Amino acid sequence: MRISTQMMYEQNMSGITNSQAEWMKLGEQMSTGKRVTNPSDDPIAASQAVVLSQAQAQNSQYALARTFATQKVSLEESVLSQVTTAIQTAQEKIVYAGNGTLSDDDRASLATDLQGIRDQLMNLANSTDGNGRYIFAGYKTEAAPFDQATGGYHGGEKSVTQQVDSARTMVIGHTGAQIFNSITSNAVPEPDGSDSEKNLFVMLDTAIAALKTPVEGNNVEKEKAAAAIDKTNRGLKNSLNNVLTVRAELGTQLSELSTLDSLGSDRALGQKLQMSNLVDVDWNSVISSYVMQQAALQASYKTFTDMQGMSLFQLNR
């Protein structure tokens, strides 16, 4: 079978074109660091990379959610730390108010002190975050949850929750009712078996009103005032216990968020390595292949050039 000069030319050109395409592809891989830039480069790896990319995006979203949750929980804990101090100060005032030898002026002075503590607690209960949203209003964050005059709660009834991992949703914002209008199951009961007061502001209002009432020379009013002070004292114990219970929960959540962050970081690192194995170049392999392909291409160029200069007259010399 005769092979024409044209056929030899076309075969050599085809070989050169293919070698050049492969060499340029290897060069592109070296410049980008990616072995797979198009699905056709490795359909299986490309498909797995798409799925893995979605998992990476989800992991990043949960990381952002945990950052937001940590900020919310930390802010609530900071405010409740101040609430704890204020309640403890109020308890000290109430214990002192139980002294039966106080004059009406002394009692009035204590009432003023308690009113200041109540105002402080009201401001804390109506605290806002950096965006002006009320942190103890549940999902009704645009309006103050507590009424300044009555201490009544008008915020949302549902706690704010946030999904912080694929299988974990947690409370990141308690309602004001859960903190300032609630007591625990082991609360100190009333001696007569009646329901214990739950509203912190009502407790303080009861004591303030009793301390403002003159009792000197009036045993009936003195007994009423003493009963009111005792009731407030029990109420403050219950309220403080409730706040401390919520704070313990917040501490547990902050610890869990930290653990989830560590797991998320480990997961992100594993996903990054897996993605690299799927689409990134093996530098030793690609550099070696690039050099070999370059040498082969140069040899093909030389062969083609030599063939172009060949003729029967040159062969017979």
From Swiss-Prot:
Localization in the cell: Secreted; Bacterial flagellum
GO BP annotations listed: bacterial-type flagellum-dependent cell motility
Major location category of this protein: secreted
Keywords: Bacterial flagellum, Secreted
Gene3D superfamilies hit by this protein: f41 fragment of flagellin, N-terminal domain
Pfam families: Flagellin_N (PF00669)
Family as reported in the entry's similarity comment: Belongs to the bacterial flagellin family.
Name of the protein described by the UniProt record: Flagellar hook-associated protein 3
Organism field: Salmonella typhimurium (strain LT2 / SGSC1412 / ATCC 700720)
